[in-house]
Amino acid sequence: MLAGRAPGSADRPGTEFGPDLSEWAPFPGDGGDSPAWSRKRGAYQAEDIARGSSAVPYAELHAHSSYSFLDGASMPEELVEEAQRLGLRALAVTDHDGFYGIVRFAEAAREFGMPTVFGAELSLEPDIARTGQNDPPGEHLLVLARDGEGYRRLSRTIADAHMVAGEKGLLRYDREALAAAGGGHWLILTGCRKGALRRALDRGGVPAAEQALRELIETYGHDNIVVELTAQGMADDDEGNAVLAGLAAGAGVPTVATTGAHFAAPRRRRLAMAMAAVRARTDIDTISGWMPGVAGSHLRSGDEMARLLPAHPDAIDNAVGIAADCAFHLGLIAPQLPPFDVPDG
């Protein structure tokens, strides 16, 4: 924050609108590419961050950046930097209904040699705005691209949903078409409390959750479903994850551990709360009651995940295996344009 420079002060001439800041450099981390700046963002310059060590290997496969508008509270670069500090084996960015931050994500990850997984969390309820509500309704579907073809298919599916809705901020996915759109190139995680499995469990107990899991398997294929166990340090995490793991075992599908991160580190918690309040157009005290897990929605090391999920080491191991199977470099999907001579001048 700028302070101590009143309009017309001796060290900075002012105007009737405040101090003249035209010569001041942009704040670090703003990218220099906001509408307020006339220059383009420069190349990412990696900090000298030592890779953390963890006795337990782990990769995060469900994380939101600030490109999940007013939901994620850390830029993609910050997520990568924190993943480096924690010693994560790979990182996925799964923003809501878009790939808006993946170039920044991929550039930062490349500097640290970190494998990248690309995905998105789809909002399946049609024509529902995410703003102006404490807890926007609707079911979510978390999709990871298994490879470049999966990325292309997911990108096309998201673009179609935006175009069909025809209004900014609204989407309309064709649920029947989703079943075929992946073509074996998507991996479906059952997601957070907004996912079909958790919603069914919360509303109808184990019988409803069993039915929801069967429907997911029938829709997307047995080999394309993984039951997500979220670790956010909540009092009921153990009980809920035990039930979910039992459902997965009964259906013969694997589990995977995630944090459902919405910011890089605990220091961003207050910012995340403030952004959620802005999204809901309410105050922090009100929104806090709707976000019980926000305090723990940050990246964690493998050692910490092992402490939070002591009964599910296989879910932690599976995160590493899935990341290894799904990771690819963004350059692999760059368009191969023909060479074109450009005259001088």
Where are these predicted regions, by residue range?
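Phosphodiester-processing cores and adjacent nucleic acid-binding clamps
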Residues: 1-345
